[in-house]
C-alpha cells in the first residue's frame, strides 16, 4: 500500500537512512526485508527497533487523501473479514498523521467511510480508539 499511495500522490520514496530513492515496488520490498528482526518474532536490539519505527512512521508520509485512508482501512477490514472476524477495535495515533499536514477531516472521513462499507459489505463491525502519543 505504501508504494500504491506514493505513486497515486506523486511522491518519491527514499530510504530513511541512506536517502536512496526507491524506483520500484520490489526495491521498497527489498528494503523492508532488512528490517526484519534477527530472532524470529522479536526485536532485541536498538537497530531493529529503529528500523521498525522508520518503516512505521515513513508510512504516515504517503497518506494524503481521504481515499488513502479509506483504502488503508478497507484493506485491514477485508483481511479481518477473511479471517472471520466480525468485530475489531482499531487503535491509531492521530498525531502521527496530523503532524504530516493531514487534516482530521481527511483522515476520519476515509476511516468512517470504510467503517460503513466494512459493516455493510463485509459484515465486520468496527470501533475506533485514538492513542495520544504526545500529550
Question: Residue ranges of each PLM-predicted region?
Answer:
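Metal-cofactor-binding active-site regions of metalloenzymes
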Residues: 1-135
Amino acid at each position: 500500500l505504501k508504494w500504491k499511495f506514493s505513486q497515486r500522490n506523486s511522491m518519491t520514496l527514499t530510504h530513511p537512512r541512506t536517502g536512496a530513492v526507491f524506483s520500484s515496488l520490489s526495491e521498497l520490498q527489498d528494503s523492508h526485508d532488512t528490517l526484519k528482526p534477527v530472532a524470529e518474532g522479536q526485536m532485541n536490539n536498538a537497530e531493529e527497533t529503529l528500523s521498525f519505527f522508520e518503516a512505521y512512521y515513513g508510512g504516515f508520509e504517503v497518506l494524503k487523501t481521504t481515499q488513502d485512508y479509506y483504502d488503508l482501512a478497507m484493506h485491514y477490514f477485508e483481511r479481518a473479514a477473511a479471517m472471520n472476524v466480525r468485530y475489531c477495535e482499531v487503535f491509531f495515533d492521530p498525531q502521527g498523521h496530523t503532524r504530516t499536514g493531514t487534516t482530521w477531516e481527511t483522515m476520519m472521513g476515509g476511516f468512517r467511510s470504510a467503517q460503513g462499507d466494512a459493516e455493510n459489505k463485509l459484515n465486520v463491525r468496527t470501533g475506533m480508539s485514538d492513542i495520544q502519543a504526545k500529550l
